[in-house]
Amino acid sequence: MEPLRKRVKVYQLDNSGKWDDKGTGHVSCIYVDALCAMGLIVRSESDNSVILQTRLSAEDIYQKQQDSLIVWTEPDSQLDLALSFQDSLGCQDIWENILQYQNQRTGSCDSVDLDLPPVSINNLQTINELLEASLPMLDKDKIINSIFKEDLVRSLLDLFDEIEKSGEGGVHLFQIFNIFKNLILFNDTSILEVILSEDYLVRVMGALEYDPEISENNRIKHREFLNQQVVFKQVIKFPSKSLIGTIHQTFRIQYLKDVVLPRVLDDVTFSSLNSLIYFNNIDIVSQIQNDSDFLENLFSEIQKSEKNSEERKDLILFLQDLCNLAKGLQIQSKSTFFTVVVSLGLFKTLSAILDDENVQTRVSCTEIVLSTLLHDPEILRSYLCSPTSGNSKFLVQLINLFITDKDIGVKNQIVEIIKTLLEADSYDSSDFFRLFYDKGIDLLVSPLNEVYKGEPTIPGDPSSNLDSFVLYNIMELVIYCIKHHCYRIKHFIVEEGIAKKILRYTNPTGSGGGGGGGGNSERYLILGSIRFFRSMVNMKDDLYNQHIIQENLFEPIIEVFKSNISRYNLLNSAIIELFQYIYKENIRDLIVYLVERYRELFESVTYTDVLKQLILKYEQIKDSSFESPETSCNNNDSSSNDIDSKPIIGNNKINHNYQRTQREIDEEEEEAYFNRDDDSEDSDDEDELIPISINNNNNNNNNNKQICTNNENNMEKNDDNIEKDNENTNNGNGSSHIKIVDYEDEDDEDDEINKSVESDDIVEKHEIIDKNEKKDEIMKENNDSDNDDNDNNDNDNDNDNNSDIENKNHLNNNGNNENNENNDDVQDKSNNKNNSDKINEDEKIEKQDEMKENLEMEEIDEKVKEKQPKDIKKENQSQPDETVFNGKSNNSNNNNNNNNNNSNNQEIGDNRKTTPKRKLDYEKNESVVSKKIDKSNGPTSIDKDINGCDESPNKKLNNNNSNNNNNNNNNNNNNNNNNNNNNNNNNNNNNNNQNDENELSSASEEEEEQLENGKHIKKFKRGKKDSNNSSNNSNNSSPTPSELHV
């Protein structure tokens, strides 16, 4: 190719981004001898000097800009260059030459370039430059072919020998070093195989000794090392020579990579050498594991060898190297190898030589065991637990060697072995754990029972003390067991007292107790003991906590804390962290134990808040440990049977659980309780039992409660008595509560009304008393007592007072019941059930009589209504509201007592009477008044009273009884009866109007009422024992006909 001479300017881009003018000259595209390739060369037009000389690249790095500019970046130096042509024709000619070279890559230049020159001293530089150049992959392949064609390696080694013998070719030896280095960096497997072959390896190592960057005094003599120091020793006959060759080659590659060329190897070449080593190892292991005879022979030779012999040491080292090679294989290949060697007797062979006197032999044995465990621990566990006799002895041998061996390397290896064996949580390892806790752990912790006074093997290094090393690792192993083997280790520690033995080593002075001392404990032994104790506390196990408390195991920890209380060191911080953990986890037993035992010490520590928080937590625990009222009420052992226990009043509420518990007392205890309280009825201490919401009967509430309860007991025992009512309202004490008597029929909704009592708002407006069945009892009592009315007037007067008191007591008790709706509901259901049972017993007998009586009542009521004057009806409708509670009325004095009795009877009425005002409200809601039919007691009628509202059944009963008495007496009594009836109705209106205006009553009237109530109560209780059991009769709980109608 003829040179094209064109006039150009050469530019180079500097670091600042500016183009520097390098000169003007003529450019040619020719073969450059110095480059041994086609290139661009620019010579100065002034002195013909070379301004630019660059090799043409086959890569697409050139760009033509406009018509006279070619720009590119050098691949090696990363310099940005540009040629600016004088005319566009010259630029086009050079551009075409570049494209032709890239497209064809042919011509005299290529064929000459890729032919290596003959090997000689004069051509060493040319060969070196050719190998150093960055060539395309095609050119590299051609050079590699030329290397093998010309036998370049052998020729260079021959030249190296001649130059080295002459002793005058220092520069040429450096050039040969660079040539071999570049051959290796070619990263071609075929070239590496030639260089590392047995024929050329030692001579190549000699050429690589002359590194120009290393001085002659520091030069490494590789040949001397390989020939004299590295000697291949065959301890056992190998099955084939190819295996031996692979072993040699692997060693040499490893030496070349790690010793000869570690500085000059790039990443690609380094990786290629590792790959070559890896595949050689696979080949070696595969050949050995496939030859079972070879392995059996190997194990047999090891067992036959004498103790502490060189032969045994070499054999075990060979086995160790073989296992190390297998560790680097893939999982499948590694698993296959270890399975084969274990099945052929690996562990049995190691057990036979584990106690060898040679340290290297013991280290190699433990290293082989550890290599097996790192692959799969189940291999050794299965071997130890196999039914073959004697296999479990291998575990005992390892533990004994850990305790007694004098080499710290052996101890370290065995500790790792035991840890690896214990790292199991699967069900398959249960057999091994059983073996370990039966035969291994007692031996493992046996050094804790002895006194150790060992000295460090290295002066000034406490960690070199072998005895302390053993103790520390025992602590670490026990800590691991505590964390992962909760069940077995827990009982072992408690039964064998391991904690107490370990905590002896917290004593830095060396004084120990209990048959052994801790010696002069090293600092790390004390920390190990604290860490062991911390692991026990960390489990938060009751057995551990009780063991700590019973054995007083905190004492050694506290002693360490006292000795370091003013020091800011690791021991102090570790113990404070222990206290902080106990506080945060709220381990109550330990908190109480610590504070009660060491409170003075904790209070003296002011530089941390942990101990103060611990004391505060203790106070909270102690406060909560006392039985609260609610808890004590639910406790059936003590508080429920304590007659002096009282409900706690807080926020105007009584403890409901307490009251419910008192009601659950059996009948005999309840009678004894109230009989005792009867004797101390005036006790002022029981005033606190009164709910704050009942403010008008504070002085007599406890007595009323007792009377009410006794009446309840009497009513339960007497079939003729009526059971107590569960839901009442305050009787004239400023309460707007209204009683409604509602008899059960098909349209009644008493169940829903009773459920609504649970709400306080509904209770205040709709307090419902569902005692329909009691009507039969009242009617029966009325019929039985009609004929004896005149004979029982005196008793009736007393009964009036007693009934009045009973009513007020019921009301006071109901004030308490309002604060205990849930408990009252429970008793309501039980009382209703008892009432219904009693009524069902008499239902068949009384049904017909009651139906007749009801019919007669209807006829009599109709006659009374016909005789009723209309002017009286108007007068009653316009009657102003007056207070009848204190016996005041506009009627005559003769009717005054009757009004009081009638008012009391209406208030009592066995808590069944409905006031007219509340009845009117009830009718407004119902809008239609319908006749109610009692399914069990027969039909009843509802008539209009003189005020135009429905008259309650009790009131009709009063009319009926009155008319019956008048029929027995003279006709004049009929008129008096009617007048009394009218007066009673007037008083009823007044009484109900008084209930409406009761909130406006004066304080003096309330005090007067309280005094009057007190007199009635005392009168009742004084006459209670003197009367002929009148309190047990029906008069105490149900009004007689004379009470209902005077």
From Swiss-Prot:
Residues 695-713, 804-820, 889-905, 958-995, 1028-1038 have a biased composition (Low complexity). One of its GO terms (cellular component) is nucleoplasm. Keywords: Cytoplasm, Nucleus. It is found in: Cytoplasm, Cell cortex; Nucleus. Residues 626-1046 are annotated as: Disordered. Residues 714-727, 753-783, 826-855, 862-876, 909-935 have a biased composition (Basic and acidic residues). GO terms for biological process: chemotaxis to cAMP; DNA damage response; regulation of double-strand break repair; signal transduction. A motif (Nuclear localization signal) lies at residues 1003-1022. Residues 1-101 form the WH1 domain. GO terms for molecular function: protein phosphatase activator activity. InterPro entries: ARM-type_fold (IPR016024), EVH1_PP4R3 (IPR055236), P4R3-like_central_dom (IPR006887), PH-like_dom_sf (IPR011993), PP4R3-like (IPR051137). Residues 665-689, 743-752, 784-803, 996-1011 have a biased composition (Acidic residues). The EVH1/WH1 domain is necessary for cortical localization. Interacts with ppp4c. Belongs to the SMEK family. PANTHER family: ATP SYNTHASE GAMMA-RELATED, SERINE_THREONINE-PROTEIN PHOSPHATASE 4 REGULATORY SUBUNIT 3. Suppresses MEK1 null cell polarity, chemotaxis, and gene expression defects. Required for proper cytokinesis during vegetative growth, timely exit from the mound stage during development, and myosin II assembly. May be a regulatory subunit of serine/threonine-protein phosphatase 4 (PP4) and may control localization of PP4 to the nucleus. Involved in the regulation of some ppp4c functions, such as developmental progression, chemotaxis, expression of stress response genes and cell movement. This is Suppressor of Mek1. It comes from Dictyostelium discoideum (Social amoeba). The gene is smkA.
